[in-house]
Curated annotation (Swiss-Prot):
Lineage: Bacteria, Bacillati, Actinomycetota, Actinomycetes, Bifidobacteriales
InterPro entries the record matches: Ribosomal_uS2, Ribosomal_uS2_bac/mit/plastid, Ribosomal_uS2_CS, Ribosomal_uS2_flav_dom_sf
UniProt-listed GO biological process terms: translation
GO terms of molecular function: structural constituent of ribosome
NCBIfam families: rpsB_bact
Protein's UniProt name: Small ribosomal subunit protein uS2
Length: 303
């Protein structure tokens, strides 16, 4: 359960929503009252939703999952970076690049380019065999990539979940996560649609103290999950598999079927002789795949 009190939330100003003329009707269920033209959020409901989201993050990390922290608005950048770094999780605190998730393969190539540039000594003109201007351009390229991709340099695959500050600001990130079936935990203010994410946290998404409080809270959930993962690993390595999203399972099954087809084709004569056997084996494979699916747990261009 999340270790947070109503007093902490009130002091951080999480109860203050937007002006009444700037609201999303779907947030009505989380609004307590209106005061001086500003909506007041019902923090009792927020607490309940925090507990649910906290347990989800903890469980996800405990099963070897990763959580991507996202917050590019000025009030959230430092909190996102510090919290994610503390628990060794990936983060995006600068501009979200289109395709960061949906075109992850290309993004990975840019990350590799960043790592390559980091090995260079930009002060060694003679040893590099490059001119000062060429080295300067390469250094600028490295600095730009560091700002854009430094937070995900160690993310080798798409995340298992995302924590987002302000879903209106990070609409593209949320959209990409949904396309890949990645659950989203997000701070949702009174001007946003709580149904746009799986785990909404109704709260003020503009107050720096409030953002820090909630971001650190979910970083604590990650930390608890890491501790639980460590305990599970010492008992059994079989519990360390990362839960796969539905799209990952589908891709894996397609690759497995493609491999089976390649191995099955030897020569035309052999195929004709063993046609019935292969047919039976293919039916069995499909039956096994269906059984596994039934048992399995459901889950701008890049510059």
């Amino acid at each position: 359960m999340a270790q947070i009190t109503m007093s902490e939330m009130l002091k951080a100003g999480l109860q203050f929503g937007h002006q009444t003329r700037r609201w999303n009707p779907k947030m009505k269920q989380y609004i307590l009252t209106e005061r001086n033209g500003i909506y007041i959020i019902n923090l009792f409901k927020t607490l309940d939703l925090i507990d649910v989201a906290y347990d989800f993050i903890k469980t996800t990390v405990a099963h070897n999952g990763t959580v991507l922290f996202v917050g590019t608005k000025k009030q959230a950048q430092e909190a996102i970076k510090n919290a994610a770094t503390r628990v060794n999780m990936p983060y995006v605190s600068e501009r979200w690049l289109g395709g960061m998730l949906t075109n992850f393969q290309t993004v990975s190539k840019r990350v590799n380019r960043l790592k390559e540039l980091e090995t260079m000594d930009f002060d060694d003109v003679h040893g590099s065999g490059l001119t000062k201007k060429e080295l300067l351009l390469l250094k600028r390229e490295k600095d730009k990539l560091e700002r854009q991709l430094g937070g995900i340099r160690n993310m080798t695959r798409t995340p298992s979940a995302m924590f987002v500050v302000d879903i209106n600001k990070e609409a593209l990130a949320v959209e990409e996560a949904h396309k890949l079936g990645i659950p989203v935990v997000a701070i949702v203010d009174t001007n946003a649609d709580p149904e746009a994410v799986e785990y909404p946290i109704p709260a003020n998404d503009d107050a720096i103290r409030g953002i820090e409080l909630l971001t650190n809270l979910f970083a604590d959930a990650v930390a608890e999950g890491l501790l639980e993962r460590s305990g599970n690993a010492s008992k059994s390595e079989s519990n360390s598999e990362q839960p796969m999203a539905a799209w990952e399972k589908e891709l894996l099954e397609k690759n497995e079927k493609a491999t089976l087809r390649e191995n099955a084709v030897v020569t035309e004569n052999e195929v004709k002789k063993t046609d019935e056997e292969e047919g039976a084996s293919s039916e069995a494979a499909r039956a096994d795949a269906q059984n596994e699916e039934a048992v399995a747990k459901p889950g701008e261009e890049v510059e």
